[in-house]
C-alpha cells in the first residue's frame, strides 16, 4: 500500500492510502502540453525505467509517457493467466535503482506489477503517464528537429498531434491486442472452450476439467503446474521439446545478503552475483553445448519418474540457448508430472475434434478446455509508422546502432533487452546511454543525432538472431544488425557495460546536426 498526498488547501493536502493497482490507473487531471522534449512510448517496466533515468539525469527536460492501455505495467498488467510469473530472477530483472525486497526471487505477476507501479509512484512518473493514448505514426522534420506524432484516444477515437524532439520507444516487441494462434483444422467442431493466455477470461474455472495446453515455451510450462492444482488432468502437447530447468523460487544467499548488508547494498551484491551466474551459464552452453545438454538431461531425469521417456519429451533438436531456456521454480512442472496430475505429449496436431484433438500419430487427446500457448505476434517499435523528411521508413532496410537506434532515423531510440539473460539488464544500460547522449548533445549545442552507416556493403544478419518461432515468423520485417560494433547487437552484459556506460558517446557513425538549416553536419 502506498501513501500519496492528495488534495489542496492550506495544509497541502491529506495523506490517503492508495493501492498499487489504483496508482497504475490514476488519470491525469491537469491539461497536458502538446509539445515536450521527449515522448516515451509505453508505461511498462521499460518505459517506467526510461522515465526514471531521464528525469534523474535531465530534470530540465520535459517528457510524457504515452500508454495505449488504461493501466500501467505493460506485460504484467496485460497477462492474467494462472501462474503468470517471471522466468528471470527479480534481482536482475528488477531496476538497478530500486531494490527487490520480496523473499521470492522468481516472482508472480501481481508482485512484479506492484513493484513497477510503486517505482512509478515513488518518483512521480505516474503523473506523467497519458493513458488510453495509442501512437499511430511519427513524422520527422530535420529543419525543425521535431517529431510530429499522431496519437489516438482509445476511449473516443479522437486523433491529435503531439510534438517532441526525441522519441524513446519502450512499447515492447509484441502486439497487445492479439496473440499468435495457428490455424487448426476442425477447430469449430470442438465443443469445449479454447482460450489464448494473452486474453485469459477472469471467470474461467478449470476445476475438474481435462485441460490441454498446446505449446512448450515459458507460458506453457508456467500454466501446466498452475492448472494441475485443480484440473482433473493437464496435458502439455508440444510439437518440439524445450530445455526446462528447475530454479529455486527463493534465492537463499540473496535473502541472507539483504539481512546482513541491508536492503540497498544486499540487493546490489545479489544483483551482481546473479548477473555473473547468468553470464557463466550462457557462456558454458555456448562453448560446451554437448556437455550442457547432458547436464540438463541429468537434472530432468532426476526429477521425473523412473523410466520416463526424457529424450522424447525434454530433448530438443537444438543446442541449449539457441532458444531461451525455460525455468520452472522449484521444479513445479516436474513435480506435477511425478504426481500424475500432468503429462506431456510430443506430436503434431492433425485436427481438432468435437472432444479434443487428433494427433498425426493417430492418438486422440480428450479435453474440456484447450489453451493455445502458441506464442506472440511480434510488432517492432510499437507498430509506429515512421517518416523522415517525407520518406517512409522501412524497418527491414535499417540497421540497428548500438542496439538502441536505427540507421538513417534521427532522434529515435528504443528499448530491446537481452534474449539470453534478464531482459531489463540491457534496457537499463540503453536508458543510461540515451541520457549520456542527450548530455553530449547539450555540450555540443546540437539537437539532432542520426546514425549513418558508412559502409553500405557491411554484411548484415537479423536483428534478433534467435530461433524462437515468434521471431522467425517476422524476421524479414525487422531491422538488421551488422558484423561489427557499433552495428552489432551485443548479448554480452560486460561488453555492453563498457560500450554503453563508459566508452565515449561520440562515434564516427553518429552524425550530429542543428535545426538551423546549417548545410554541414557535425560529425562524431
Locate the predicted segments by residue.
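Glycine/threonine-rich phosphate-binding loop and adjacent beta-strand/alpha-helix elements that clamp
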Residues: 373-442
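Feature captures the FAD/FMN-dependent oxidoreductase FAD-binding
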Residues: 103-175, 351
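Rossmann-like dinucleotide-binding core of oxidoreductases
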Residues: 32-35, 39-40, 45, 49-50, ...
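C-terminal active-site-capping segments
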Residues: 428, 432-524
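Beta1-alpha1 glycine-rich phosphate/pyrophosphate-binding loop at the start
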Residues: 20, 33-40, 45-129, 238-239, ...
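Core beta-strand elements of the Rossmann-like FAD/NAD(P) dinucleotide-binding domain
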Residues: 36, 156-166, 207, 360-369
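Short beta-strand to alpha-helix junction loop
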Residues: 100-118, 214, 284-293, 319-332
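Alpha/beta-hydrolase fold catalytic core
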Residues: 303-366
